Curated annotation (Swiss-Prot):
A GO cellular component annotation in the UniProt record: Rpd3L-Expanded complex
Pfam families linked to this entry: LisH, WD40
Principal subcellular localisation of the protein: cytoplasm
Keyword Cell inner membrane annotated: no
Function per UniProt: Component of the set3 histone deacetylase complex which is involved in chromatin remodeling and transcription regulation, such as repression of the sporulation gene program.
SUPFAM superfamilies: WD40 repeat-like
Domain annotation LisH: ranges: 2-34
Keywords: Chromatin regulator, Cytoplasm, Nucleus, Phosphoprotein, Repeat, Transcription, Transcription regulation, WD repeat
InterPro entries xref list: Ebi-like (IPR045183), LisH (IPR006594), WD40/YVTN_repeat-like_dom_sf (IPR015943), WD40_repeat_dom_sf (IPR036322), WD40_rpt (IPR001680)
Gene: hif2
Name of the protein in question: Set3 complex subunit hif2
Amino acid sequence: MDTNQVNYIIWRYLKECGYSHTKFAFERETGIQNLDKQWGSTCQVGALVEILQKGLQYVELEKHYVDNHSSNEEASKTSIDGESLVNENPCKLPFYLTVPHICETTLTKADSTNGFCEHNNSNDHQLKILQDKGSGSPSSPVMPFKDKIEKRDIDITMADESNVEKDPARPIAVYNSSPVTEITEIKQVTFTGGEDIKSDFFKVIPTKHPVTCADWRPLLQENYHVYEFSIGMTNATLASVSICEEQNDFKAKTDYCLQSSFDNQDITGVAWNNSGSFLAYAFFSGVIEIYDSHGSQILSFHNNKGPVLSLKWSGTDTYLAAGSADGTITLFDQLKQTQYSIDTLASSVLDIEWISFDEFVTSDVEGSLRVYKVDGKAPVSTVSHAHDNSIVALRYNLRISLLLTASSDTTVKLWSRGDAGAFECLHVFSFSSPVNCIDWNLREGTPILAVASNSIVSMYNAISLQQLAVFMRHTAPVSALSFSHNGRYLATGDTSGGVCIWSCKTAKLFKELGSDNSELIAVTNVLPEEQVNFLRWSFDDKDLLIGKQKKEIICCCDFLHDSL
């Protein structure tokens, strides 16, 4: 068998055994989806996969269950089979490829004071290396096992912080005996536009502090009625919120809420990785913290001396890249559990986009584009003064390998990579005012892009460069826009708090959310706390998050029940 055939067998094994996260990363790394599947008709791939499954059952059993080392001498002499391991010490925590595994067992208090036991396998050595690091790039050690955060013990209200010991190496969590907090103050807001609109289409979820950013956790197949998103707020507060939409019933609850040790620091970025196993937060001080899906801190980086302005995972979840206002780029390698910094010797890094699994492009206030590889600290290629002014946004279309850049010099440019790897400009879109928002419609078919200049949103064909539609509904400059993943909707928000949801098929207004302060906005044209800072679609396009600098986050619900 050649390499491709071996890869195909491994891919089939991962797929049929339900290892969805590993299968996703393996597909992206090997390009297995582009290989010839006809080979499977001439070889008994199913039989080979069955052999792999049987052979690895014992390996998985050894990984998922832990010997009770405190058992008496007679018990230790007795051979322990798989069934007894399952009954005595089942592991309660999930496995990931990128972090050392810690087994949670049902040990008695005499065996363990906190109910957690370090798994005695090859991961022990990796964990010891992480905890013993004392040189190199500064980072916080892995959190002690006793700091594991259980979802049921944490309340979003953060009411009692007096009895919590503040440790600068880890976040502060408030422990409560009460169950998960149910958010009961959900209210409805007024809206206009569209036909057959339900009165509960927009939901307002209150928060403890003003919201600065949010991101959806990738949808888990085992519970497709529950959607989880994480939000970052002022005062260094992080929270995870779950919403349940089943049988027209909308419920929201707080899974956990954390108070970081960096008080009075706004959270500037939040990003889930593609498999939903790790969550990264960035602070105005430049600190970056990584958490697992249960809310436990894994690592903390202190390389940046300025606010982190861009925070993005690579497509395979292998790397995390962060761009800072001090011109520093921080890279974290999940597989090696290492991180390092790149000093761009330039001004602020405003945005970062991954263009392959190990390459990314950056933009800065000088209007330059730089391409980096993860294994080097010098740029692979540079386009100096790609724009006459700062490049405020980057969007890369991986399917057609085109880069879109937006600048405050009132232009948007379309780029492709030449034979030497450097970006070359294909076309310039000129506007009458600075451009702050751009996005790609990533549906299959003709590539479409959207540009917002002042209060006008334009949609173009990226191949013919023809203008397809112009949306003129906003009365204030557009501050955020986003296409849904299925390409059916375009959401736009402005500095006055107005939000419009457009049909991409008909180029007509689908739904609209008005501002609560329309009279005041008509005079001032802007209210900082009303400005729409971000729009985030859920992975199945059923819900849309609307974020402002207010103590609330708005959720637009049930898009799947509306037909265009």
